[in-house]
Regions:
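ABC transporter nucleotide-binding domains
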Residues: 22-27, 32-208, 213-227, 232-233
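Short, charged/small-residue-rich alpha-helical element at the C-terminal edge
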Residues: 246-319, 325
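ABC transporter nucleotide-binding domain
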Residues: 192-282
Length: 325
């Protein structure tokens, strides 16, 4: 959704600079109810230039409602949104002039070609948007199909055209609602590449909502986990992954079942057998030599003891009390 105007070229304020630490997007205490149902409750986060920020949660968690508040399609009951330094409620046009977005699905006309769709939306924007069409078509790898009707495009091609459309206004902030939803693995990989490129090479702040744990893990720098309308965890992806592993080690041993029994006195919780030759156990570093010696004494073959990387799935299960995405 390219958004028209409210600023001249001199009002961008350098927000496309990936080294700037001024927040491109700031959400403070966002709360929204529909009747007696509270869809979003006191959600806060910041997003910086050149960063991919993941908003992770299951369907119905409050992701789309939050996005609608971020782009002015819904008014929060409480809280505020600032974009490019402008308060969204008080200075809507100037705030939204910094934003390109796809909410739920790209707004495209199937009977028009890709080029005609981009021209249609470019005409709503300040001078210069039409001149970016060829460049954006190359960026999203659609230059060879730009003059074909959109109704002939695959879902992934439509999604990439939607991203090109959202970039027509040269935004500092790109908001994408479930951009990989329904795509095949190749399509998901292409969206991931494009999003990372926009952040790294153009300094665009990218907000991505998703329920795909592995994709958020690979695509995003930081993430907020939202569940039942509440933000349960926020932080750098790697920091959350490190927290989820919390000292867990993978023991490549044989036989695994017997090794798991022997590790019980050294482990912080019940060791978990993974197959015939693998055990996951949380053993403190200072106890590792003693644990290894105990296994060797009992004739256990030890092939390796290595730190076990965490996953966003484990983080999600931990903060939600075991509920799945």
């Amino acid at each position: 959704m390219p958004v028209n105007d409210g600023r001249g070229d001199g009002e961008r304020g350098g927000l496309g600079d990936a080294n700037s630490r001024e927040a491109v997007l700031s959400a403070e205490g966002l709360t929204k109810s529909f009747g007696k149902r509270q869809a979003v409750a006191d959600v806060s986060f910041e997003l910086f230039a050149g960063e991919v920020f993941g908003f992770l949660g299951p369907n119905g968690a409050g992701k789309t409602t939050t996005i609608r508040m971020l782009v002015g399609l819904a008014r929060p009951d409480r809280g505020r949104v600032r974009i490019g330094g402008f308060d969204l409620a008080r200075d809507f046009a100037r705030a939204m002039a910094h934003v390109g977005s796809i909410v739920e699905s790209p707004d495209l006309y199937g009977y028009l070609t890709g080029r005609e769709n981009l021209l249609h939306f470019a005409r709503m924007l300040p001078d210069g948007a039409q001149g970016r069409i060829a460049e954006l078509a190359r960026l999203v790898a659609l230059e060879e199909r730009l003059d074909d009707r959109v109704e002939t495009y695959s879902l992934g091609m439509r999604q990439r055209l939607g991203i090109a459309q959202a970039l027509l206004g040269a935004p500092d902030l790109l908001v994408l609602d479930e951009p990989a939803n329904g795509l095949d693995p190749a399509g998901i990989r292409e969206i991931r590449r494009l999003v990372r490129q926009l952040a790294a090479e153009r300094g665009i702040a990218v907000f991505v909502s998703s329920h795909l744990l592995s994709e958020v893990e690979q695509m995003c720098d930081r993430v907020t986990i939202i569940h039942r309308g509440r933000a349960l965890a926020t932080g750098p992806v790697q920091e959350l992954l490190d927290r989820s592993s919390s000292g867990a080690t993978r023991w490549r041993v044989k036989p695994a079942a017997r090794a798991a029994e022997l590790l019980i006195p050294f482990a912080a919780d019940q060791p978990e057998v993974e197959g015939e030759e693998s055990v996951i156990a949380r053993v403190a570093r200072e106890k590792l030599p003693e644990a290894v010696a105990a296994l060797v004494r009992e004739g256990i073959e030890i092939f390796a003891v290595e730190p076990r990387a965490g996953s966003l799935e484990e983080v999600f299960l931990d903060v939600t009390g075991g509920e799945t995405v």
